[in-house]
Amino acid sequence: MAAPQTDLPVPRTSGFHLLRVADVERLCADAVAVTFDVPTDLQDVFAFRPGQYLTLRLHRDGTEERRSYSICSPAGALPKVGVRRVDGGLFSEWLVDRVAPGDAIEVAPPAGSFTPELEPGTHHGLVAAGSGITPVLSIAASVLAAHPDTRVTLLYGNRRTDTVMFTEELADLKNAHGPRLHLLHVLSREPMEAEIFTGRLDAVKLRLLLGALVDVGDVDHWWLCGPLGMTEAAVEVLTGFGVDRRRVHRELFYVDEPPPELHRPDPAIEGATSEVTVVLNGRSTTMTLPRAESVLDAAQKVRADLPFACKGGVCGTCRAKVTDGEVTMRRNFALEDEEVEAGFVLTCQSRPDTDAVTVDYDS
């Protein structure tokens, strides 16, 4: 089925490519996996690392909508994204209920840093809840296929058996790799044979599961994806077990709470604007921007090609490096601590603090 009708021509913005849907696989009642066909001349552009995501773009009723969806296929395969329907969600309802093979969708190249190194002899711990399995599945399949001595421990939480995404794919991975994949399913609204596997993946449950069934100290890296509360609980539990925080990585799809408000000094004293230079695709543009707006929102009025998706500090699409001046980042659920220390920010959450600021999207 074709995309919703638009009342304005779709602008040709650099970074997006029209890809055909190769397959739509029903995973459960409210979720699908959408595979994209990639033309030969774009295969290098859409080569991805496990754990990355694609940003999809749709124009409807004169407005532009963007959503990011994690890739679930292993490295080297066609890009496939997992999508769960969100009530009232324009994009997810369209993808889950209407999209069919042959449809064309605007897609930006893979992005994201929630990606492991495919090194031999490593043990990766994965904790996912609900649709958070999507990038985790790509990571698990890729690291297991990369070397015969890699291992994966995966804790996967869901409400009920019929809400589990990628049931067959996980079973196939277990059959293919046997003891190298330690797979633990936990259900919150359906009793399991062993009580330890019944309940939500909160701090109490995670502490119980990890303490009883996993050699936490043997795991080299941990990868967390799911609701904010689950990932925060997992970080707390893992660091409580002595895991180095730098070895714990997390990915979020959305955050319900609004970002904190910034309390600015009197603009008559401190200045109401900054000279901001943005660098993207080798081109620099300097503009006078209000300090009351994020760098992304203000700069987009001049540079419409700036990358973005969620604008909520979650996906990381708008990541850039501050090479001059200072900004205040309201919140960050996408960048690792090391990235922030190196000067990277989410421009959708960052407001200028100094008279001059330079942000480099190419870094």
Would you name each region that the model predicts?
Residues 1-13, 18-20, 30, 40, ...:
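Iron-sulfur (Fe-S) cluster-binding modules
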Residues 4-104, 108, 158-161, 171, ...:
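Ferredoxin-reductase
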Residues 75-78, 118-122, 147, 352-361:
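Ligand-binding loop in jelly-roll beta-barrel domains
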Residues 93-268, 272-277, 284:
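FNR/FR-type flavoprotein reductase catalytic core
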Residues 226, 234, 252, 278-280, ...:
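Active-site proximal loops enriched in glycine and acidic residues that flank catalytic Cys/His/Asp
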Residues 271-311:
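C-terminal accessory/binding modules appended to enzymatic or scaffolding proteins
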Residues 285, 298-307, 316-363:
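Iron-sulfur (Fe-S) cluster-binding segments and ferredoxin-like electron-carrier domains
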